[in-house]
């Protein structure tokens, strides 16, 4: 198996010294650099760079700068996704994000883990686990999502949370480690939006 194949199979792989992976990361970093230095008002150029980075035709995806990712092609984005400023997608493992997802500033989605034994760690070994984000979710600022986590549809993750385990759908979850506080009523509202119906 190539190191890339090992990475995608969630096996230990050489993350630091494999030239093919180094080249793929360099490609993504160059595109991120260009995106981060493109005027926010130049929407056509930004759309072109975002599609090139993720190697797909995105549908109403908005990314505030600065933004960083390792590969880009291993991020699967739904439609109507908003990524606020200074977010990082560590996409050695696949990151799947559903439709209508709001991601606050300074959020990180970290698919990689390293050996605890520093001898192995110093040899460049790494393992990547997927992250799955359901549609209609919202992340407050400074949220960290760790490898192997699934966050269910319609959930809200409070600012500063560190998500180490799965979060069920329609949950309000906060903290370090992130825990469910209560369920969210995501039924279609029968009343007009006001201070009472917002909670």
UniProtKB/Swiss-Prot annotation:
Class in the EC hierarchy, top level: transferase
Gene3D superfamilies (UniProt xref): Hexapeptide repeat proteins (2.160.10.10)
Pfam families cross-referenced by the UniProt entry: Hexapep, Hexapep_2, Mac
Domain of life according to the entry: Bacteria
InterPro entries (alphabetical): Hexapep, LacA-like, Mac_dom, Trimer_LpxA-like_sf
Enzyme Commission number, as recorded: 2.3.1.-
Gene Ontology MF terms: galactoside O-acetyltransferase activity
Keywords for the protein's UniProt record, in alphabetical order: Acyltransferase, Repeat, Transferase
Family of this protein: Belongs to the transferase hexapeptide repeat family.
Stated name of the protein: Putative acetyltransferase SAR2635
